[in-house]
Structures are given as C-alpha cells and as structure tokens.
Amino acid sequence: MGVRTTSKNAGPTGANSTPFVDGHLDKFYNSSFDRGGAGTNPEAARLGHEASGGAINVYTEPDGKIYRAHIFTASGTFAVTTASTNYPGVEYLVVGGGGAGGSISGQCGGGGAGGVATNMPGITNQDSVSLTRPAFPVSDGDSITVTIGAGGGGWNGGSPYSRLPGLPSKFGPTIEAFGGGAGGGGAAGEQFGKAGGCGGGGACSNPPSNGPGGYGNRDGAPNTQSGNPSGQPNSGFSQGRNGGNSGPYEAGFFGGGGGGAHSDGQNGGGAGGTGKGGDGLQIKIAGPTTATQPMGTPGPSPGGGYFAGGGGGGGNSGANPGDNSTAGAGGGGAGIGGGNSPTQNPPGTRGQSGQRSTGGGGGGVAYPLPGMHVRAGSGGSGIVIVRYQVGQTETSTAKATGGNISFYGGKTIHTFNTSSTFVTPAPFSETCEYVVIGGGGAGGFHNGGGGGAGGYTTGTTPISGSNTLTVTVAGGGANLIPGQPTNGIAPSGPPSGSSIPGSPSSWPGGTAGGGGGGAVENGQGANAPSPSPQGGSGGGAGRGYPGGANGGSAGSLGNAGGNSAPGGNTSTGAGGGGAGGAGENGQPTRGGSGGIGVQLPATFRDPKGGAGVPGPGGQAWWVAGGGGGCNQPPASPSSIPGGAGGYGPGQAVTPYAGGGMGGNQTGSDYNDPLAAQPGGMNTGGGGGAGTGPQSPEGRRNMGGNGGSGLVLIAYPT
C-alpha cells in the first residue's frame, strides 16, 4: 500500500513568531489537518485527532491501522483542535540532546547520549527493564509546548574540559528527556564523566589518573556522584545508561564510551575494553515497522530508527594507532585513536559529532600534539515524535514514496529533512517541481562575521518510470575554532581565518552548495565553497582590526557577505550573505545583519507541511537567511543581541528566514542568552557570529552552527 497522508487542502494562514529556545530556532509548524466525511465502512468512519505541529508523515501498518506522526526537529507546539473519542491519547518519543565528548590531553571520554522518554509499547533496555510510560491523554484545545534540546558543543581548549552536556527535550511540562552527560577531559580533576540522561565516559591523563564514567538517569540511580555535583534528578523512569570507565594511560587503551539509552558505554581498557559507546534504542514511531524509518539511524536490527547512542572514547597510540573507538548505534560519534603518521589519525584528531535529531553523544579525542587546539565531537540535537491512529477517510495515497508527504493545492509534496531516497513506480510519469537548499555556513567568533546561507535553487524536471533517486540533505557548518581545518586541528595563538562552510544538498534534479563560514577578528569571510557554479552565499567579515576586511564572495546561488565596519577599530562583525541579498556591512555601533532570505514558491506554501520560517512582515515559508555579525562593547550596548539573521539592512531583535542572531558580550557562559545562535534547522540559514574573549580561562565565545539544508519535491496529485 502506498504512503498515505491528508487529502483536504487549506489556504494559507498567518505566521507565528520564532524565538530561539535551547540553542535551536523555535519554529511553529502550523500543520493543521481537517477531518474528512464519514463513509459506510465503520472503520473508515472513525476519526483521529484534529491536530497540528511538526512535519507530518502518515503511514499504514501491516495490520491496516493508519497512523499520523508529527516529527519535531525544532521546538514548536503540538496543538489539538479536537480530540478523538475513537482513538484516544497519543504515543510519543522524546530524546534529549547528546553530551559532548571530552577533549584536551589524555584518553578522553565519549559523550553520553540524551535520555529517552517514551510510551511506545515493548521498549526495554539491556537489563530487560521496561521503559514504556503510561498513556498520554489529550483533550480539545490542548496546546502542548515542544522543546528540542541542543547537543553539547564539543570544546577545543581551556578549562574545564568536561563542561558541555546536552540540553533537555520536553513534551509539555511533564515529559522531559534529560540531556546527555559530557565525556571526561584529560586535565587533573576533570577525568570523571558527567551524569545526564546517559552518562559521559571517563578519561585518563598523564600523569595517570583514571576517571569513572558518569551515571545515566536510571530508575533508582543516585542523584549525584562523587566529584560531580551536576547529576540530574531521577525522573522516576529509566532514561539511559552509565558511561564506561577510562582505561589506564597506556598505548592501545581508550577513554570510556558514553552511555547509550539501551546499554552502558564500554570501559576503555582491560579485558574486552574498547571505549565503545553504549547502544541506543530502536523505536519505530515515525514510519511503518516494515520499512526503513524516516528518522533515526541504522543499527543492529534492520529498518533503522535507532536513537540515543553513546559517543566513543578517545584513544592513546599503540600497535594500531589509527584505530578508532566505535560509537553506539543511534547517532553517536566515534572516538579517535592515537597515531603518529599522516596516514593514520594524527594525534589530536577531532572526535566525530553525534548525528543531528538523534541525541547521539559526541566522540572523545586522543592526546594532542604540543601547541594544538583539539575539538571534541559535539552531541547530536534531540527530537520529539508524536503519533496517533486515524481513520481511512482522513488519508489519500501518494504516487511515490520518500520523505514526509503532504497534499496541498492539487500537488503532492515530499519534504526531505534528512537524506533519503525518492522512489517512483513504473507507471509514474510527472513533471516534478523542486527546491534544493544547501547547508548554511557557521558564524565566526572572536569579533566574528555571520555565516553565509546555503545555496537556493528551484525548477522543474520530468521523471518517468521506476526510479530510486538519492536525495542528500546537507548539514550546516560546524562552529569550529577559527582557522581550524576540517580535521579539527589548529595551531595555538591569535585567531584568524574563518569558520567551517556548509555542505551541498542535492538530488538528480539539482544541487545547491553550502554557505561560506563567517570570519574571525581581522579575517575575510569565507567564499562560498565548491561546487563554485552552484555555491551559496559568502560569509561576513570580522571586525577588521587594525585594517578593513571584505566579506566572502558568493556562488551563483547566493550573495556576498558584508564587509567590516569602516575605521578598523570597531568591535562589530558583518552579516553573512543570504539567498535574497548580500550581508550588511559591520556598523559603527552594531553588528551587520545577515542578508535577506527568500520565500518558497507558492506550490510549497502549505500551512500543513512545516517548510520554512517567518520572514519580513511576519509572512511564513522563508528560508536561507544569512547569519548576523557580532556586537561587542563599547561599540554597542551589552543588552541587545548582535546583527539580526536574515534581516537585510537595518536593526532587529528577532531573526528572519533561518539566519542566526549574532552574539554580544555579556558573560562567560557558552549558553549565555545573548550568545550567537545557530541557523535554523532545515532552512540553510547561516550561523550567527560570536564575540571576543570572555572567561577567566581565555575561551572565546563560539559562533552558531549553520542550519541544515532541505529538499522539496512536488507533482500533481
């Protein structure tokens, strides 16, 4: 049976505001579903909830039951207009953000996965303990806030090294999945893994001091542990497992693996010790149990749908110094082994990050070379999925499969938030309209410029016959240390260069390249990366002290980043370019705003589908805005954020089109309310720029990650 989704159409509705929540763009997916008329079949006459929110996927199980899943990869609202008496309640999966891996010297621990809260039946951990929570009833008029926790940012220098846990995800006020604990770092007193939804792995330093793994939030687990006052309170339900202990500081050993939602992270040494991250859980809630799940990752059992895997621990050199520890199934990042030649992992190679929208923990790193800054893997962001049963009168059948499917304006729309395939059967013969958006570039930091938006392209292409077409949805650029190559190593000393660009999104109909990274201090914004003819927007210039600096140039699918402020001594950065206009130059008293984005074509302006975010005038369906440049006193007041993402020339306090707001100097914490904000998920927005040195240990506030890309495909219903 084909993929099913709602068949009734609705006209455009007003947009909603989009504040940032817990490090992610808070966008309300106004996804209302009207009821169809009753038929003569009693089962067909049964109706499900009339509800809105998130990206929608409606699917049929082998037993004939039809479910509607609301998938939230960014914060929003699940709103129930009318609750069903035929199919009461909802089932849910809530996953917190993953913790970062440990960094700096030593065998560092893997980050713990985000905790898992679910009432799906039959879900158990490695001890066969049921994780299934009670039923969740809903009523007419319920408006349930959904919060998506950001993953902890992997660090690259300074102290403390085991600092950045994931943030919690929530479904209403009562269902909370805690963020994962950060992995232990290599400095004295920092070797223990942090507690969290799943515990971070322990680390070991030289001189030797082995660190224990952090506690996961298990039923009956202590609230705190020795040396770790930040343990999460017990939830009353098991959420995750413990991190592994570090092995001794010897060749061939690893830091402990981060805990996963299903199993503990492995110890980093001794009999059977490999530093592997603990496995996550397979929860098939977003799609039919007989098909590959549209969300989650592959794992030991077929069908994907794994979430909350722990990050692998970092290694020491040994007989096989290129060996890496393994991440747990469910989106965790691999830890990195030591090495001593260019053909192996160089000492200090960065840990892999957890995958977005899985809650996976970040990978730990190995010992660094002298004078190197080393970055641990960041944790993956969390996710919330809500589903309920609906009747046959509320569905229609699509002609193709792939992505999340909706019907609007006589068209069938496939929305790809993650990489997948678009599959057409032999009778298929349609002219498909499409939009492809590349990943946004990261914002720079230390008086940086905003990241450039990913490339934006739209068009039509004929498709006939049986095809399995690869759809690649890009990730946004990571907010790495300025001047740091993609292997994660950078020389110490004054900052220079630019942050990491976004990646290209593609399908056979078209490709859109990533946006350029924002510059740092006196650096020039990065040009749009290759492929140049399809490149996105350029990154914004840094403050340009002592002289001026230029914004990055654009490819054919974007616009240039802004230049530094005149005068050369103003502590403000320029905005990154947007798909609809160039980034604003840095201003004498404020950061430049990111270049304006574009509004999706009319075909894709479906209020039920969830694509795009608000733009100028509060209108919805905008994408690919540039990241805002930074502010820093005394050039600008400390009470206002930096340049507005995606706004175009002028000043604002809220972002447009998925561009991240630039940061301002108010405090030392990475999670400061005026810290740089990331580009919006699935908008291709550029990340906002960070400000100058803040904390006693000399850290520099980080720029925001670039927003991930998007692919939309439509054809006549």
What is each stretch, according to the model?
Residues 2-717:
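Low-complexity, glycine/proline-biased repetitive segments and flexible coils/loops
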